[in-house]
């Protein structure tokens, strides 16, 4: 049994997905969607990670995500989605679904306009649904083969449907920074941070730190650490900070 538990731990670290808590709001768009540097009209990826443990404790965790971007001469359109759930002793302990869409229009080599919409369901953190719509201006600060950096901001609106009952609509300010560093031909570092704030009692900060290591031309190992902080969380899930660590196998379309 001890040997089996050690093997389970190794499998957990090498091929699984695990989390401290489900994220209440984890939509951070980190893909560099600049149409001026696109090498092909479509880029996409799908990734998944799974963990299962049996014995004295029975648990499972599944994480899956996809991201797709279509390019034109000065426009880019993106769709993304992710799902994660965790069960322990045949009881569901977290369940999160998130989908979103985005468009970008380049005004010139550095300036662009964007629009972005997302939907989140995370009942274990108090939300049957959370809908966010934002639009605004962005600046492509770096766009080289090694370093890519963009910053964007604009107004937004969010609709929250609480799992415990009730709903609320808020006007928000949105800001985000996304950075990519091509460390080697096969290794890429990604960092993204977004902020949604009502400039009062409700502010949400999302962060994603990732490392992607290519196995071959199609498959890669993707490691990610997500943090979500909300200074005014739902009453049914009072923790302000949620984290998620994942290890996934990614396939490039």
Q: Could you tell me what each predicted segment is?
A:
Residues 46-50, 64-70, 101-105, 135-139, ...:
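Residues on the lipid-exposed face of transmembrane beta-strands in outer-membrane beta-barrel proteins
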Residues 36-52, 74-79:
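Transmembrane beta-strand segments of Gram-negative outer membrane beta-barrel proteins
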């Amino acid at each position: 049994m001890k040997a089996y538990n050690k093997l389970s731990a190794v499998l957990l670290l090498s091929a699984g997905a695990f989390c401290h808590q489900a994220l209440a709001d984890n939509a951070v768009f980190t893909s560099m969607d600049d149409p001026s540097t696109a090498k092909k009209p479509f880029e996409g990826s799908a990734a998944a990670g799974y963990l299962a443990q049996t014995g004295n404790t029975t648990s499972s965790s599944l994480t899956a995500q996809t991201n797709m971007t279509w390019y034109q001469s000065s426009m880019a359109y993106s769709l993304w989605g992710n799902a994660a759930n965790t069960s322990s002793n045949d009881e569901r302990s977290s369940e999160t679904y998130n989908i979103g869409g985005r468009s970008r229009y380049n005004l010139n080599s550095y300036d662009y306009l964007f629009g972005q919409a997302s939907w989140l369901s995370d009942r274990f953190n108090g939300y049957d649904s959370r809908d966010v719509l934002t639009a605004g201006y962005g600046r492509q600060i770096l766009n080289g083969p090694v370093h890519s950096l963009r910053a964007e901001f604009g107004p937004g609106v969010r609709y929250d449907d609480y799992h415990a009952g009730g709903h609320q609509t808020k006007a928000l300010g949105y800001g985000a920074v996304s950075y990519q560093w091509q460390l080697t031909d096969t290794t890429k570092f990604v960092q993204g941070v977004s902020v949604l704030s009502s400039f009062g009692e409700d502010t949400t900060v999302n962060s994603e730190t990732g490392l992607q290591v290519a196995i071959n031309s199609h498959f890669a190992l993707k490691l990610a650490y997500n943090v979500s902080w909300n200074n005014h969380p739902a009453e049914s899930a009072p923790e302000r900070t949620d984290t998620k660590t994942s290890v996934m196998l990614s396939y490039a379309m």
